[in-house]
Amino acid sequence: MKVDAPVRKAYWLVCVFALSFFGCQQQPPQSVPPIAAGIEHLLNDSGLQALGKKLFFDADLSTPPGQSCAACHSPEVGWTGPDEALNKGGSVYPGAVHSRFGNRKPNASAYATLTPQFHAVREGNEVVFVGGDFWDGRATGWKLGNPAADQAQGPFLNPVEQNNPDAEAVLAGVCRSSYAPEFRSAAKRIWGIDDACKADTDFAYGIVGLAIAAFEHSPAVNQFSSKYDFYLKGKATLTADERRGLELFEGKAKCANCHTSRPGPNGEPPLFTDFRYDNVGVPRNPDNPWYTMPAEFNPDGEKWVDRGLAEFLAEIPQYAMFAQANVGKHRAPTVRNVDVRPTPSFVKPFGHNGYFKSLEAIVHFYNTRDVLPAADKVNDPKPGVNCWPAPEVAQNLNTTELGNLGLTAEEEAAIVAFMKTLSDGYQPT
């Protein structure tokens, strides 16, 4: 697409104001606010949110048509994977080409826009990484000013997801859609572009990412309407089990060390994540279909190991030196909506690879990972009963905040009861 003068002018304006002061460069920012300067007004724009919703649910923006963002991020399951059969097994979802699979469980897209841009902080002698979207942080937010906006562009072009050959193909689909007038209108109203369908490809594709992020930022997605939210406002009462679970969550079980549960300094609702990276020792999921993907996608085959954050750090010159110290680490997800499901018996997987098939299972793992023997040391191994499989990655294991928490079965159940109060859609009586 040819760039005319008005578009070049608009691009400069968007770099300065709309995409934050860091949006024109692929470099890590020096300081990172919760939502980067100049981006919040876009995320709160109701017209951009409405456009983003149509993009999010459009199944015609894949090659072949048939896969929308919602295929892996569905509201009825807390904006993550809605296919119970897949959840029970590998927990990784197929792409538009149904024989192709990715390598990790879909993250929840709710509350993702509140993730800070990917950055490093120094704590004593340690460099700690914070923020970024995807399990490995590679959607940094350095491009469009918000990690969720960067993330929204990724699946469209991933051959194991929506499989479009390039951004122009995505834009062609947008421009022939029923909502193409809204795309043009938003571009004209916000950025002064006469026709977004004839604008610079990178710029127009940036609008797509920003619009999807705006929808994900809307009250329809980031609801803050759980029982716990009402409890914090004094409008709901926790049961005895839920109160006990909250006490354990913030105390003995150490959950709140990573899944922050208290309001922010200005009363902001808690996000239940510190956006940092840990290796909690999740076992390999033998049902992960990534192991059987062709060599063009997975050259390591059955020997593939999920290196997590390290894989991304190794690609960034200024951070590559920290890759080894972060092998096996994945970003702590929010635990908001962890129990949202269409029916009480519906199976939701947990962990970056979906190894755990219930909240009870992953809480028990955090409690007993270092207590039960390794699976290869027992006869008739039953994970979670008489053993746990070895971690997929044994190095950089977090041994200070989980593994031997000393919780009773009743205390584990209380923690699960509390986590169930984090589901949006609660109706106070």
Give residue ranges: language-model regions.
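Intrinsic low-complexity/disordered segments
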Residues: 8, 22-24
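Bacterial N-terminal signal peptides
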Residues: 12-21
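N-terminal secretory signal peptides that target proteins for export/translocation
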Residues: 1-7
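Periplasmic c-type cytochrome electron-transfer domains
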Residues: 24-429
